[in-house]
């Protein structure tokens, strides 16, 4: 039986001037388990912001910068970088790997010790993963945000949303709260 699915939030690739206020409003409106930030030096402010709220804060694709800024870990898009990231960040850091829609890549990442595997919005893959594997699976929703509840029901541990939340006409806080309620 699937467990409770949680919200994993992806920040925009560049921080707009009002991002601190927008992020605060989202984090106050919805239970966010993890925040992925672009690998930019300015991410330090938002790392601390999330960590002060007990939200894991990861950098996207740069383990060295993640270590330097004090991030909780790193999200990788290439499983070949996993071993180096783990050595650099240590066993206490979160190291997740995006695997697309490849079962094989996901199994390799899990076998290597990834803390989570992130997959594309592939319902069959998520259901299979939830049934046979123990490593948490993150579904990268992309524009499939309306299908989040389906992925949660299929066994996703986390759903990742970014632009559809921050660009929602109803406002990012309302969009995040709605998504969190749909997947709980």
What residues fall within each predicted segment?
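Catalytic-face loop-and-helix region of soluble metabolic enzyme cores
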Residues: 127-143
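Conserved catalytic cores of soluble enzyme domains
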Residues: 89-90, 122-131
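Conserved residues at the C-terminal ends of beta-strands
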Residues: 38, 77, 119-120, 162
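Generic structural marker for isolated residues within well-ordered, non-membrane alpha-helices
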Residues: 23, 82, 126
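C-terminal binding/interaction regions
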Residues: 158-159
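Gly/Pro- and small hydrophobic-enriched strand-loop and loop-to-helix capping segments
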Residues: 71-82, 120-121
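Short, ordered loop/turn segments at secondary-structure junctions
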Residues: 62-63, 79, 121-122, 164
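Conserved N-terminal beta1-alpha1 strand-loop-helix module at the mouth
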Residues: 1-75, 88-101, 107-115, 134-135, ...
